[in-house]
Amino acid sequence: MQASPIRIPTVSNDIDWDFCFHMSQQTEIPAHQQTDELYPTGGCGESEEETKAKEKEKAIDCMSHPKEKLAQSQKKVAQLIKEKMNTQANKELIRCVILSRIIFGDHHWKCARALANLAYGYLTLRGLPVQAKKHATSAKNTLLTWKANTTSNKEKEEILEALVKLYYTLGVAWLLQNRGREAYFNLQKAERNMKELKELYKGGVCELQVSENDLTLALGRASLAIHRLNLALAYFEKAIGDVIAAKGDRTSDLISLYEEAAQIEQLRRNHNQAIQYLQQAHSVCVSLFTEVSPKTAEMSALLAKAYAMSGEAQHRDAVEIYFIRSINAYRATLGSEDFETLSTTEEFCKWLVQNGEKQDK
């Protein structure tokens, strides 16, 4: 059972970012000019102390507007993601970076965190690993410097959260580009930062945008990419256990996990164990989607092929049973001329020919 190739969308340049970055450079006001240029003071009758007090007050007012805009943009991002308006959400993340740069400056950890959020957005909302790596890399050194120097536990927690997201983004972006070693290297760093973060929380529950299960799955896939099959299987077994503990043994989240675990077992030539994983996935499909559904048909076909791959004579009946179930379910739900119906029928015919039989007409 081969893993499906991943299509990586690319663009020649990052137009949204380049335009907004240019605007932010024009918008950012040097600190020494903020009161003089925006708020000229000219009260000839005012004392020096009164003038300084007014200048300070105006400087605070000058920065309150971008801060309000930043808070609004952050709320808007969450709402747009909830509404699955991914492109608009990504553009709003760009606004957050620009506003953070204006408020905090290029070298502040909060600006770097905004860049890490943007990188994660390019990865998860847009599926653009090149842009994701670009922005994550530009944020990394700033976050690491602040992490090393901060004395505030609260600040360190937020920096560690940003680093988990940053290294996860880099890892998955490399994985999408079929660079397993680089992916695994960065995901290990994400894992170390998550461990440090959990120690700071002192065992308390921390809700992170990149969950521990997200990271476990990514590490499993990266391990598979570098052919460390035993390690990959250990990560997937952990992910399966965590999902069952959190959501029960009939959640749709388990289907793809069982499929990937079965793929690893097939690569390890443990065909019986692969069949067991696919049987569990099939059972979940039947309970969630019924026996006659495209998803259950797909899982029946995978089970048929897994039984066939074992090469054991005792599994011949199971191969036929699951191929026929799959074809019948596809015909009932998608029609006789659908691609899935035809391709599954073709695979069944090939298996019958290879085994010296003819398909009944």
From Swiss-Prot:
| Spans traversing the lipid bilayer | none
Which parts form a coiled-coil structure per UniProt?
67-95, 176-209, 256-283
Keywords carried by this UniProt record: Coiled coil, Cytoplasm, Cytoskeleton
Compartment(s): Cytoplasm, Cytoskeleton, Microtubule organizing center, Centrosome; Cytoplasm, Cytoskeleton, Spindle; Midbody
A GO CC annotation recorded here is:
centrosome
Tell me one GO biological process term.
Answer: response to endoplasmic reticulum stress
InterPro entries, from UniProt? TPR-like_helical_dom_sf, TTC23/TTC23L
Q: Which PANTHER family match?
A: TETRATRICOPEPTIDE REPEAT PROTEIN 23, TETRATRICOPEPTIDE REPEAT PROTEIN 23-LIKE
Annotated protein name in UniProt: Tetratricopeptide repeat protein 23-like
Q: What is the primary gene name for this protein? A: TTC23L
